[in-house]
From Swiss-Prot:
Pfam families: Polysacc_synt. This is Uncharacterized membrane protein MJ1375. It is found in: Cell membrane. InterPro entries: Poly_Biosynth_Transport, Polysacc_synth. It comes from the Archaea. Keywords: Cell membrane, Membrane, Transmembrane, Transmembrane helix. GO terms for cellular component: plasma membrane. The chain crosses the membrane at residues 20-40, 43-63, 78-98, 109-129, 155-175, 243-263, 300-320, 328-348, 360-380, 388-408. The keyword Cell membrane applies. Its main location: membrane. It is a multi-pass membrane protein.
């Protein structure tokens, strides 16, 4: 199956998932109000970052190892799932202490919200594992179905749970959706392998956990560390502005900024549609022409979206959130450009990981994260939420340029 066809499958699921994600946030914005929605937006990047770091960083490593195997034996990957669960429990325990690092308005939030965030980390393990296997098998059609099921469940659950449990209910709906998607993902693995996936071994905790720290598992874990650090840093990088705004300015302005930030992130559905199948294919072929093909596809997919955000920013703001705050409009224009540069870096990062240079990708995004934190702390204090968007734009351009330089240097060695 070609990269283009794989990308179309992922794009279609991402279009659906992004649409459902907008519906998820629309429902929470409608039910919670701007300030409570701002608190949710301030917690979501924390939940996502911890989920990636303690759980979802391993699946790309699984995909790489699996894609390089001549004879596939899925059952030997089962102990990895238990290792992921163990790491996620550590993340759950550490979550309540995050507020002391974030400070500001985060200190005023009840602990139950932080426990809800921790629950998201634990619940994500099964769906993350199944996606790693499906990606490694190059079953992109099945992989795309896991997103569809997850987001469908999330939207169904969020309305009821948010209505009765508020912000806690919104976070709980995410955990339950992870579980539903994870169980469905295991079924898809069984279907893809035509019954060769041993469910008995999956639930045989006693024997499976004996191999949890095998050399094979540790090799995957070691490879996943820079990927997990890169991905979690990348996620934190993308929303450090919202976190700083929440900490310094509180829930209301975090909500206003969150509206614009959420819409601008729509560009990433195009980039992820290309980057997900790009990693295992470059890992197999070491062909950088695939990166060029991916960049062209991303440009075609993203151009209309960016133009719309630049010239008609008030339309999506009013359509989705019934508000068009002047600061929010300006932020959306700036963030659309920023997201375009970061979408290109998403492809560059996947190429670096596929070529075995995951550490370089991590160093680049770590530099970007530190720069973004510094700029946000300065500019948010000086210019409010507009300062947050300017800080993100400056950092995005810097990260993109460094990524291009790294790829050009590596290309010389390959040639």
């Amino acid at each position: 199956m070609s990269l283009c066809k794989d990308s179309i499958y992922i794009l279609m699921s991402n279009l659906y998932s992004k649409g459902m994600a907008y519906l998820f946030y629309f429902i929470t914005a409608f039910l919670l109000g701007t300030e409570a929605f701002g608190i949710l937006k301030g917690l979501m990047p924390i939940a996502d970052t911890l989920t990636i770091f303690f759980s979802s960083g391993i699946p790309p490593a699984i995909a790489k190892f699996l894609a390089e195997e001549k004879e596939v034996d899925i059952n030997k990957y089962i102990p990895i799932l238990y290792l992921m669960i163990l790491l996620s429990v550590v993340g759950f325990i550490l979550t309540p202490y995050i507020k002391y690092i974030l400070g500001g308005h985060y200190l005023n939030l009840p602990n139950i919200l932080y426990f809800a965030v921790g629950l998201c980390v634990v619940a994500s393990t099964v769906i993350a594992f199944s996606r790693g296997i499906l990606q490694g098998l190059l079953k992109m059609k099945y992989l795309s179905l896991t997103w569809i099921v997850e987001y469908t469940a999330k939207v169904i659950l969020v309305f009821i749970l948010t209505l009765y449990l508020g912000i806690f209910g919104s976070l709980l709906s995410i955990s339950l959706a992870y579980l539903v998607g994870g169980i469905f993902g295991l079924y898809l693995i069984y279907k893809a392998l035509k019954g060769k996936f041993d469910f008995k071994k999956l639930i045989d905790i006693k024997n499976t956990t004996k191999n949890i720290f095998s050399n094979f598992n540790l090799d995957i874990l070691r490879y996943s560390i820079p990927i997990a650090l890169t991905s979690s840093s990348y996620r934190l990088f993308g929303d450090i502005d919202n976190i700083v705004i929440m900490s310094i300015m509180g829930g209301f302005w975090s909500g206003i900024y969150g509206y614009s930030s959420l819409i601008s992130r729509g560009i990433f559905m195009f980039a992820s549609a290309v980057s997900i199948p790009l990693l295992p294919r470059i890992s197999k072929t070491k062909d950088l022409s695939l990166l060029k093909e991916g960049i062209i596809q991303n440009t075609i997919f993203s151009s209309i979206f960016v133009i719309g955000c630049l010239f008609f920013p008030e339309i999506p703001l009013i359509a989705f959130f019934k508000t068009a705050n002047p600061e929010g409009i300006l932020c959306l224009r700036i963030l659309a450009i920023s997201s375009l540069f970061m979408s290109y870096y998403t492809l560059i990062s996947s190429a670096l990981q596929g070529l075995g240079y995951a550490k370089i990708s991590f160093y680049i995004i770590l530099f970007g994260l530190v720069l973004n934190i510094i700029l946000n702390l300065i500019l948010v204090n000086a210019y409010g939420i507009v300062g947050g968007s300017l800080a993100t734009l400056i950092t995005s351009i810097s990260v993109f340029l460094i990524g291009v330089f790294a790829i050009l240097r590596i290309k010389k060695h390959i040639i």
